[in-house]
């Protein structure tokens, strides 16, 4: 029995005031990913997988928010299908629970897989860490990643809106509430 949970955080093309330009759609541009071992509580295999957007361009607003530039994507980006294959090869996620902080990551992954007609590399078993945190702490309202860390007396490690760093910090929260 595998004791790992895959934790992801996606960064996607975005625009100021959520105004999507005509003819463009939100595309995943980074898959931040790591593994949490439920038994040992160790977090490992943290990485960023940069993805070439197929239906949109990276806006200046998106670069300012995420630090992801068109140049970075040109140098390190791979096609979404290749990113999914890399995840399958390195994490073997099809039988593991996967998690993210909120519903966006699950929904965007499913939408992009559906659009491209490829199989989602992850299992059907998804944990919404934001909901788990709220329920674990008996909170009425949801809170963001930074506030959840603060509530646990933990500092954010890395850069906010870096997929790998956000996934790692989400895994730290999950580790505390499991």
Region locations from a protein language model:
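Metal-dependent phosphoesterase core characteristic of DEDDh/y 3'-5' exonuclease domains
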Residues: 2-3, 24-31, 35-68, 89-178
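Short glycine-aspartate micro-motif
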Residues: 5-7
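Short acidic, Gly/Ser-rich segments with clustered Asp/Glu that frequently serve as metal-coordination loops
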Residues: 10-20
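A generic structural signal for short coil/turn motifs at secondary-structure boundaries
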Residues: 17-19, 74, 135, 158
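Metal-dependent phosphoesterase signature
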Residues: 63-86
């Amino acid at each position: 029995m595998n004791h790992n949970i895959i934790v992801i955080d996606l960064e996607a093309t975005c625009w100021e005031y959520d105004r999507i330009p005509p003819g463009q759609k939100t595309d995943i541009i980074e898959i931040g990913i790591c593994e949490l071992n439920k038994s040992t509580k160790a977090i490992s295999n943290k990485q960023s997988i940069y993805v070439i957007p197929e239906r949109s361009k990276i806006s200046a607003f998106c670069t300012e928010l995420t630090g992801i530039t068109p140049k970075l994507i040109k140098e390190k980006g791979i096609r979404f299908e290749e990113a999914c294959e890399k995840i399958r090869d390195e994490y073997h996620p099809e039988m593991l629970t996967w998690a993210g902080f909120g519903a966006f990551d699950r929904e965007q992954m499913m939408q992009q897989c559906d659009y491209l007609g490829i199989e989602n590399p992850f299992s059907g078993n998804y944990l919404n860490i934001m909901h788990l945190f709220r329920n674990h702490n008996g909170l009425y309202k949801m809170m963001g990643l930074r506030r959840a860390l603060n509530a646990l007396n933990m500092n954010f490690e890395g850069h906010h809106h870096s997929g790998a760093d956000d996934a790692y910090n989400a895994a730290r929260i999950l580790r505390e509430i499991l």
